[in-house]
UniProtKB/Swiss-Prot annotation:
It comes from Dictyostelium discoideum. One of its GO terms (biological process) is tryptophanyl-tRNA aminoacylation. It catalyses: tRNA(Trp) + L-tryptophan + ATP = L-tryptophyl-tRNA(Trp) + AMP + diphosphate + H(+). Pfam families: tRNA-synt_1b. A motif ('HIGH' region) lies at residues 22-31. It comes from the Eukaryota. Keywords: Aminoacyl-tRNA synthetase, ATP-binding, Ligase, Mitochondrion, Nucleotide-binding, Protein biosynthesis, Transit peptide. This is Tryptophan--tRNA ligase, mitochondrial. Gene3D superfamilies: HUPs, Tyrosyl-Transfer RNA Synthetase. A motif ('KMSKS' region) lies at residues 242-246.
Amino acid sequence: MKIDEVNFKDKTKVTVFSGMQPTSSALHLGNYLGAMGNWLKIQDLVTKNNKEEEELLNLSESSSSSSSSQSTKINEKHKLIFSIVDLHSLTSTKSLSPKELQSNTISVAINYLACGIDPEKVILFNQSMVPAHSELTWILNCITSFSKLSNMIQFKEKTKSSNEASVSNGLLSYPVLMAADILLYKATHVPVGEDQTQHLEFTRDIAQAFHSNFKSKFFPYPSIITSEQSKRIMSLQDGRLKMSKSDPLEISRISLTDTDDQIKLKIKKSKTDTIIGITYDPINRPDISNLLSIASETSGIPITDLQSEFKDKSNAIFKEFLSNSIIKNISPIREKINYYQSNPKLVRDILLQGSEKANKIANKNLNIIKDIVGLYH
Protein backbone atom coordinates (compact mmCIF):
# COMPACT_ATOMS: atom_id res chain seq x y z
CA MET A 1 0.00 0.00 0.00
CA LYS A 2 0.99 3.64 -0.43
CA ILE A 3 1.53 5.90 2.58
CA ASP A 4 -1.67 7.81 1.86
CA GLU A 5 -3.60 4.53 2.05
CA VAL A 6 -2.58 3.86 5.66
CA ASN A 7 -5.57 4.66 7.88
CA PHE A 8 -4.01 6.52 10.80
CA LYS A 9 -7.51 7.57 11.88
CA ASP A 10 -8.61 4.00 12.46
CA LYS A 11 -9.10 2.84 16.05
CA THR A 12 -6.52 0.09 15.53
CA LYS A 13 -3.06 1.06 16.75
CA VAL A 14 -0.51 1.65 13.99
CA THR A 15 3.14 0.81 14.67
CA VAL A 16 5.62 1.60 11.90
CA PHE A 17 9.11 0.07 11.99
CA SER A 18 11.96 0.61 9.58
CA GLY A 19 15.73 0.55 9.68
CA MET A 20 18.87 1.32 7.73
CA GLN A 21 22.33 -0.24 7.95
CA PRO A 22 25.34 1.90 8.94
CA THR A 23 27.44 0.55 6.07
CA SER A 24 28.64 4.06 5.23
CA SER A 25 29.39 7.23 7.17
CA ALA A 26 26.91 9.27 5.10
CA LEU A 27 23.56 8.67 3.46
CA HIS A 28 23.30 9.45 -0.23
CA LEU A 29 20.74 11.23 -2.36
CA GLY A 30 18.95 7.96 -3.17
CA ASN A 31 18.47 7.27 0.55
CA TYR A 32 17.15 10.77 1.13
CA LEU A 33 14.69 10.76 -1.77
CA GLY A 34 13.71 7.13 -1.17
CA ALA A 35 13.56 5.58 2.31
CA MET A 36 14.14 8.81 4.22
CA GLY A 37 11.50 10.64 2.21
CA ASN A 38 9.06 7.88 3.14
CA TRP A 39 9.95 8.13 6.82
CA LEU A 40 9.52 11.89 6.89
CA LYS A 41 6.13 11.69 5.21
CA ILE A 42 4.95 9.05 7.71
CA GLN A 43 6.28 11.17 10.58
CA ASP A 44 4.32 14.19 9.34
CA LEU A 45 1.11 12.21 8.79
CA VAL A 46 1.15 10.57 12.22
CA THR A 47 2.05 13.81 14.00
CA LYS A 48 -0.74 15.66 12.22
CA ASN A 49 -3.28 12.94 13.02
CA ASN A 50 -2.29 12.69 16.69
CA LYS A 51 -2.48 16.46 17.03
CA GLU A 52 -5.94 16.60 15.45
CA GLU A 53 -7.24 13.86 17.74
CA GLU A 54 -5.71 15.51 20.79
CA GLU A 55 -7.35 18.83 19.91
CA LEU A 56 -10.71 17.09 19.51
CA LEU A 57 -10.33 15.47 22.91
CA ASN A 58 -9.37 18.77 24.51
CA LEU A 59 -12.54 20.31 23.12
CA SER A 60 -14.79 17.46 24.22
CA GLU A 61 -13.37 16.84 27.69
CA SER A 62 -14.31 19.29 30.43
CA SER A 63 -11.87 17.89 32.98
CA SER A 64 -8.25 18.87 32.38
CA SER A 65 -6.95 15.79 34.17
CA SER A 66 -9.15 13.54 32.04
CA SER A 67 -8.00 15.35 28.92
CA SER A 68 -4.36 14.92 29.88
CA SER A 69 -4.87 11.20 30.45
CA GLN A 70 -6.61 10.80 27.10
CA SER A 71 -3.90 12.79 25.29
CA THR A 72 -1.26 10.42 26.60
CA LYS A 73 -3.22 7.50 25.17
CA ILE A 74 -3.49 9.25 21.81
CA ASN A 75 0.26 9.89 21.69
CA GLU A 76 0.84 6.21 22.42
CA LYS A 77 -1.67 5.09 19.81
CA HIS A 78 0.63 5.35 16.80
CA LYS A 79 4.30 4.46 17.26
CA LEU A 80 7.08 5.32 14.84
CA ILE A 81 10.21 3.25 15.44
CA PHE A 82 13.26 3.91 13.27
CA SER A 83 16.47 2.01 13.88
CA ILE A 84 20.09 2.00 12.82
CA VAL A 85 20.37 -1.75 12.29
CA ASP A 86 24.03 -2.26 13.15
CA LEU A 87 23.68 -6.00 13.81
CA HIS A 88 22.72 -6.47 10.17
CA SER A 89 26.00 -4.83 9.14
CA LEU A 90 27.90 -7.77 10.65
CA THR A 91 26.52 -10.01 7.89
CA SER A 92 28.25 -8.03 5.15
CA THR A 93 30.94 -9.85 3.19
CA LYS A 94 32.99 -6.64 3.42
CA SER A 95 33.02 -6.27 7.19
CA LEU A 96 33.69 -2.89 8.73
CA SER A 97 36.32 -2.52 11.41
CA PRO A 98 34.93 -2.05 14.96
CA LYS A 99 35.90 1.63 14.88
CA GLU A 100 34.28 2.13 11.47
CA LEU A 101 31.04 0.48 12.60
CA GLN A 102 30.79 2.60 15.75
CA SER A 103 31.67 5.77 13.86
CA ASN A 104 29.20 4.99 11.08
CA THR A 105 26.42 4.36 13.59
CA ILE A 106 26.81 7.86 15.03
CA SER A 107 27.19 9.34 11.53
CA VAL A 108 24.00 7.70 10.27
CA ALA A 109 22.14 8.95 13.36
CA ILE A 110 23.41 12.44 12.55
CA ASN A 111 22.16 12.05 8.97
CA TYR A 112 18.73 10.93 10.23
CA LEU A 113 18.44 13.97 12.48
CA ALA A 114 19.75 16.37 9.83
CA CYS A 115 17.17 15.10 7.32
CA GLY A 116 14.37 15.89 9.76
CA ILE A 117 13.74 12.79 11.87
CA ASP A 118 12.46 14.22 15.17
CA PRO A 119 13.29 12.20 18.33
CA GLU A 120 10.30 13.85 20.03
CA LYS A 121 8.01 12.15 17.50
CA VAL A 122 9.99 9.01 16.69
CA ILE A 123 11.76 6.31 18.71
CA LEU A 124 15.26 6.49 17.21
CA PHE A 125 17.86 3.98 18.41
CA ASN A 126 20.58 1.62 17.27
CA GLN A 127 19.63 -2.03 17.14
CA SER A 128 22.43 -3.53 19.24
CA MET A 129 21.39 -1.45 22.27
CA VAL A 130 18.22 -3.55 22.50
CA PRO A 131 19.28 -7.17 23.29
CA ALA A 132 15.73 -8.46 22.75
CA HIS A 133 16.34 -8.30 18.97
CA SER A 134 18.94 -11.07 19.26
CA GLU A 135 16.86 -13.13 21.70
CA LEU A 136 13.80 -13.12 19.48
CA THR A 137 15.98 -13.92 16.46
CA TRP A 138 17.09 -17.15 18.13
CA ILE A 139 13.51 -18.13 18.96
CA LEU A 140 12.41 -17.49 15.37
CA ASN A 141 15.47 -19.28 13.97
CA CYS A 142 14.31 -22.40 15.77
CA ILE A 143 11.05 -22.50 13.79
CA THR A 144 12.60 -21.61 10.41
CA SER A 145 13.87 -24.22 7.96
CA PHE A 146 17.26 -24.10 6.28
CA SER A 147 15.66 -24.66 2.87
CA LYS A 148 13.40 -21.62 3.26
CA LEU A 149 16.36 -19.39 4.13
CA SER A 150 18.69 -20.76 1.46
CA ASN A 151 16.06 -20.09 -1.22
CA MET A 152 15.71 -16.40 -0.41
CA ILE A 153 16.53 -14.33 -3.51
CA GLN A 154 18.99 -11.96 -1.81
CA PHE A 155 20.87 -14.86 -0.21
CA LYS A 156 21.28 -16.53 -3.60
CA GLU A 157 22.44 -13.30 -5.21
CA LYS A 158 24.98 -12.53 -2.49
CA THR A 159 26.43 -16.04 -2.40
CA LYS A 160 26.46 -17.09 -6.07
CA SER A 161 30.02 -15.82 -6.51
CA SER A 162 31.22 -16.93 -3.05
CA ASN A 163 32.84 -20.11 -1.85
CA GLU A 164 30.36 -22.07 0.32
CA ALA A 165 32.88 -22.23 3.15
CA SER A 166 33.03 -18.42 3.30
CA VAL A 167 29.25 -17.89 3.59
CA SER A 168 28.32 -17.01 7.17
CA ASN A 169 25.30 -18.26 9.06
CA GLY A 170 24.57 -14.60 9.78
CA LEU A 171 24.02 -13.93 6.08
CA LEU A 172 21.79 -16.98 5.82
CA SER A 173 19.63 -15.94 8.79
CA TYR A 174 19.58 -12.24 7.89
CA PRO A 175 15.81 -12.42 7.10
CA VAL A 176 15.14 -13.92 10.54
CA LEU A 177 16.84 -10.98 12.26
CA MET A 178 14.85 -8.62 10.05
CA ALA A 179 11.64 -10.45 11.00
CA ALA A 180 12.58 -10.18 14.68
CA ASP A 181 13.19 -6.43 14.29
CA ILE A 182 9.67 -6.01 12.99
CA LEU A 183 7.74 -8.52 15.09
CA LEU A 184 9.40 -7.51 18.37
CA TYR A 185 7.49 -4.22 18.29
CA LYS A 186 4.34 -5.82 16.84
CA ALA A 187 4.76 -3.53 13.83
CA THR A 188 1.69 -3.20 11.64
CA HIS A 189 3.35 -1.35 8.76
CA VAL A 190 6.87 -1.43 7.32
CA PRO A 191 8.14 0.93 4.59
CA VAL A 192 10.58 -0.97 2.37
CA GLY A 193 12.19 -0.82 -1.05
CA GLU A 194 11.48 -3.22 -3.89
CA ASP A 195 14.47 -5.40 -2.98
CA GLN A 196 13.11 -6.09 0.52
CA THR A 197 9.54 -7.14 -0.29
CA GLN A 198 10.38 -10.86 -0.15
CA HIS A 199 11.78 -10.37 3.35
CA LEU A 200 8.51 -8.76 4.43
CA GLU A 201 6.58 -11.70 3.00
CA PHE A 202 8.95 -13.96 4.94
CA THR A 203 8.17 -11.98 8.12
CA ARG A 204 4.47 -12.63 7.64
CA ASP A 205 5.20 -16.32 7.03
CA ILE A 206 7.31 -16.63 10.16
CA ALA A 207 4.61 -14.92 12.23
CA GLN A 208 2.14 -17.47 10.86
CA ALA A 209 4.54 -20.31 11.71
CA PHE A 210 4.92 -18.97 15.26
CA HIS A 211 1.15 -18.83 15.70
CA SER A 212 0.77 -22.35 14.31
CA ASN A 213 3.57 -23.84 16.43
CA PHE A 214 2.54 -22.25 19.71
CA LYS A 215 -1.24 -21.94 19.21
CA SER A 216 -1.14 -18.22 19.88
CA LYS A 217 -1.92 -15.20 17.72
CA PHE A 218 0.44 -12.64 19.22
CA PHE A 219 1.95 -10.92 16.19
CA PRO A 220 0.07 -8.76 13.70
CA TYR A 221 0.82 -9.48 10.04
CA PRO A 222 2.72 -6.36 8.92
CA SER A 223 1.67 -4.55 5.77
CA ILE A 224 4.22 -3.27 3.27
CA ILE A 225 4.30 0.47 2.63
CA THR A 226 5.70 1.03 -0.83
CA SER A 227 7.79 4.04 -1.76
CA GLU A 228 6.12 7.31 -2.68
CA GLN A 229 9.16 8.13 -4.78
CA SER A 230 8.04 8.19 -8.41
CA LYS A 231 11.37 6.94 -9.82
CA ARG A 232 14.28 4.97 -8.36
CA ILE A 233 17.53 6.87 -8.01
CA MET A 234 20.28 5.09 -9.89
CA SER A 235 24.06 5.33 -10.05
CA LEU A 236 25.51 8.44 -11.70
CA GLN A 237 27.90 6.15 -13.55
CA ASP A 238 25.44 3.45 -14.60
CA GLY A 239 21.75 4.25 -14.92
CA ARG A 240 20.89 0.55 -14.74
CA LEU A 241 22.25 0.11 -11.20
CA LYS A 242 20.78 1.52 -8.00
CA MET A 243 22.73 4.31 -6.30
CA SER A 244 24.57 2.57 -3.48
CA LYS A 245 26.66 3.40 -0.42
CA SER A 246 28.78 0.31 -1.11
CA ASP A 247 29.71 1.25 -4.69
CA PRO A 248 33.52 1.65 -4.75
CA LEU A 249 33.15 4.58 -7.17
CA GLU A 250 32.65 7.71 -5.07
CA ILE A 251 31.48 9.65 -8.15
CA SER A 252 28.58 7.21 -8.57
CA ARG A 253 26.58 8.86 -5.78
CA ILE A 254 25.80 12.20 -4.18
CA SER A 255 26.44 12.04 -0.43
CA LEU A 256 24.51 14.30 1.92
CA THR A 257 27.86 15.60 3.18
CA ASP A 258 29.15 16.59 -0.28
CA THR A 259 30.12 20.22 -0.76
CA ASP A 260 28.56 22.31 -3.52
CA ASP A 261 31.73 21.94 -5.60
CA GLN A 262 31.75 18.16 -5.14
CA ILE A 263 28.12 17.96 -6.25
CA LYS A 264 28.83 20.05 -9.35
CA LEU A 265 31.84 17.91 -10.24
CA LYS A 266 29.97 14.61 -9.79
CA ILE A 267 27.07 15.79 -11.93
CA LYS A 268 29.48 17.15 -14.54
CA LYS A 269 31.15 13.71 -14.71
CA SER A 270 27.86 11.79 -14.59
CA LYS A 271 27.32 9.41 -17.49
CA THR A 272 24.98 10.41 -20.33
CA ASP A 273 25.00 9.27 -23.98
CA THR A 274 25.69 10.57 -27.50
CA ILE A 275 22.05 11.10 -28.48
CA ILE A 276 21.15 14.77 -28.99
CA GLY A 277 18.43 16.18 -26.72
CA ILE A 278 17.15 15.43 -23.22
CA THR A 279 14.46 12.74 -23.32
CA TYR A 280 13.13 10.22 -20.81
CA ASP A 281 13.58 6.64 -22.02
CA PRO A 282 14.73 4.30 -19.20
CA ILE A 283 15.18 1.33 -21.55
CA ASN A 284 17.24 2.92 -24.31
CA ARG A 285 18.63 5.93 -22.42
CA PRO A 286 19.04 4.79 -18.78
CA ASP A 287 21.69 7.35 -17.83
CA ILE A 288 20.00 10.55 -19.01
CA SER A 289 16.65 9.16 -17.77
CA ASN A 290 18.16 8.73 -14.30
CA LEU A 291 19.36 12.34 -14.30
CA LEU A 292 15.88 13.46 -15.34
CA SER A 293 14.40 11.47 -12.45
CA ILE A 294 16.78 13.13 -9.99
CA ALA A 295 15.99 16.56 -11.45
CA SER A 296 12.27 15.91 -11.09
CA GLU A 297 12.54 14.62 -7.51
CA THR A 298 14.73 17.49 -6.33
CA SER A 299 12.96 20.31 -8.17
CA GLY A 300 9.37 19.10 -7.92
CA ILE A 301 8.96 19.63 -11.68
CA PRO A 302 7.32 16.72 -13.58
CA ILE A 303 9.59 14.85 -15.97
CA THR A 304 7.36 15.75 -18.93
CA ASP A 305 7.84 19.46 -18.21
CA LEU A 306 11.60 19.02 -17.83
CA GLN A 307 11.76 17.23 -21.18
CA SER A 308 9.92 20.11 -22.84
CA GLU A 309 12.21 22.68 -21.25
CA PHE A 310 15.51 20.95 -22.07
CA LYS A 311 14.71 18.95 -25.23
CA ASP A 312 16.77 21.28 -27.44
CA LYS A 313 19.42 22.18 -24.87
CA SER A 314 22.83 20.67 -24.28
CA ASN A 315 23.73 18.18 -21.58
CA ALA A 316 25.91 20.85 -19.97
CA ILE A 317 22.99 23.27 -19.54
CA PHE A 318 20.76 20.51 -18.16
CA LYS A 319 23.49 19.36 -15.76
CA GLU A 320 23.92 22.91 -14.47
CA PHE A 321 20.19 23.01 -13.65
CA LEU A 322 20.43 19.58 -12.02
CA SER A 323 23.43 20.57 -9.88
CA ASN A 324 21.68 23.68 -8.58
CA SER A 325 18.52 21.70 -7.83
CA ILE A 326 20.44 19.10 -5.81
CA ILE A 327 22.44 21.76 -3.95
CA LYS A 328 19.21 23.53 -2.97
CA ASN A 329 18.03 20.28 -1.34
CA ILE A 330 21.27 19.17 0.26
CA SER A 331 22.91 22.36 1.54
CA PRO A 332 20.50 22.86 4.51
CA ILE A 333 20.93 19.19 5.44
CA ARG A 334 24.70 19.54 5.27
CA GLU A 335 24.55 22.52 7.64
CA LYS A 336 22.56 20.47 10.16
CA ILE A 337 25.02 17.59 9.80
CA ASN A 338 27.83 20.00 10.70
CA TYR A 339 25.83 21.14 13.74
CA TYR A 340 25.30 17.62 15.07
CA GLN A 341 28.91 16.65 14.34
CA SER A 342 29.92 19.53 16.58
CA ASN A 343 27.59 18.20 19.31
CA PRO A 344 28.32 14.45 19.55
CA LYS A 345 27.04 14.19 23.13
CA LEU A 346 23.62 15.40 21.99
CA VAL A 347 23.49 12.62 19.39
CA ARG A 348 24.60 9.94 21.88
CA ASP A 349 21.97 11.14 24.37
CA ILE A 350 19.26 10.93 21.69
CA LEU A 351 20.25 7.34 20.86
CA LEU A 352 20.39 6.44 24.56
CA GLN A 353 16.94 7.88 25.20
CA GLY A 354 15.60 6.14 22.11
CA SER A 355 17.07 2.80 23.20
CA GLU A 356 15.45 3.18 26.64
CA LYS A 357 12.05 3.66 24.99
CA ALA A 358 12.68 0.78 22.58
CA ASN A 359 13.85 -1.53 25.38
CA LYS A 360 10.70 -0.81 27.36
CA ILE A 361 8.46 -1.96 24.49
CA ALA A 362 10.76 -4.79 23.39
CA ASN A 363 11.23 -6.34 26.83
CA LYS A 364 7.51 -6.24 27.57
CA ASN A 365 6.73 -8.05 24.32
CA LEU A 366 9.65 -10.48 24.67
CA ASN A 367 8.46 -11.58 28.12
CA ILE A 368 5.04 -12.38 26.66
CA ILE A 369 6.72 -14.28 23.82
CA LYS A 370 8.80 -16.25 26.35
CA ASP A 371 5.62 -17.19 28.21
CA ILE A 372 4.05 -18.37 24.95
CA VAL A 373 7.13 -20.42 24.03
CA GLY A 374 7.61 -21.77 27.56
CA LEU A 375 10.89 -20.05 28.46
CA TYR A 376 11.35 -19.32 32.15
CA HIS A 377 12.18 -15.69 32.95
